[in-house]
Amino acid sequence: MDPTSLGLVVKPPKARVVRRRIITICIYAASWLLLVLLSPLWIPLGILIGLARRRSFVLLRLLLFGCFYLGFELMALVLIAGVFLLYRADARASALYRLQAWWATINLKVAQRLLGLEIVVEGAENAVPGPSILLIRHASILDTLLPCVFVQRPYGLRVRYVLKQELLFDPCIDLVGNALPNYFVDRTGDTPKELEGLRALVSNIGTDSVLIFPEGTRFSDEKRRRALEKLKSQGSPLCDSAHALTRVLPPKPGGVLTLLDALPGIDCVFFAHTGLESFAKIKDLLSGEVVGSKVRIRLWRVSSQEIPAE
């Protein structure tokens, strides 16, 4: 779950790693306990609001998912601790990859069941073999789950993620994400330093793939408008082509170009999806439009020979 979906910019606590993890785990545990204790109140209230507003009981569905998600997070933390205690070196990495894919799959399946989602996937086999650069559309708070569920778990592909640091607020993402080769970008930090971090991430990529969100942030019509205005004010030669992109933001080239430069001769795999737009923020979810949505996912591969050298 992405805490920025609440409409707030939630930064990881400014403290040492151990202290940060204690804080976030305590927040998750307290939130889950509070939801459980108050369930005799919010369950009937959610039913009454659903009957009154006629929005497919979306508030009740979201509260049920939130209660599950927080409780499942705590259970997963116990399993993560077990992996760290029982496994060593390569065996630990393999176990964490399996646990990561399982965690994502369970979360997505529960969301799918509670919200009545229909998910159709086409071309997932194009993600293998690695190595490759996975370029995924960013439109919802569930986007980080999709590659784990539809690429990593069924095909055994190890994926290295480029994610924003705000996701470290999630204890499972923090612990597993930092134990495996991934990079958490400080979007307010030193850009050259962040790009150097991407180069280090893929310096020994082997048969793994690396995933990045070229847009840099979740899509919205307002963000697209601002991005186009910025390109126009800068007199960018990309302005016309950016206007043709109606359902994605103009890509931020720095990260992708850095990966292409660091990984010459490697294919790119595009991971497109539609139907999750109502998952962008909590206020979008509360509209009820998400219930019964059809989610379409399509992957296609572009050979390195088709990618311009300049």
What do these predicted ranges mean?
Residues 182-187, 194-195, 223-227:
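Cytosolic, positively charged, low-complexity intrinsically disordered regions immediately flanking transmembrane
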Residues 80-103, 113, 132-190:
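Catalytic core of membrane glycerolipid acyltransferases/transacylases, capturing the structured
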Residues 2-132, 146:
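Membrane-anchoring hydrophobic helices of lipid-metabolizing enzymes
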Residues 117, 157-159, 266:
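A structural micro-motif
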Residues 153, 165-180, 204-309:
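A cross-family acyltransferase "interaction/gating" segment
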Residues 25, 142-143, 193-194, 250-254:
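Short, glycine/acidic-rich beta->alpha junctions
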Residues 191-203:
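A Trp-anchored, charged/polar loop motif used as the substrate-binding/catalytic surface
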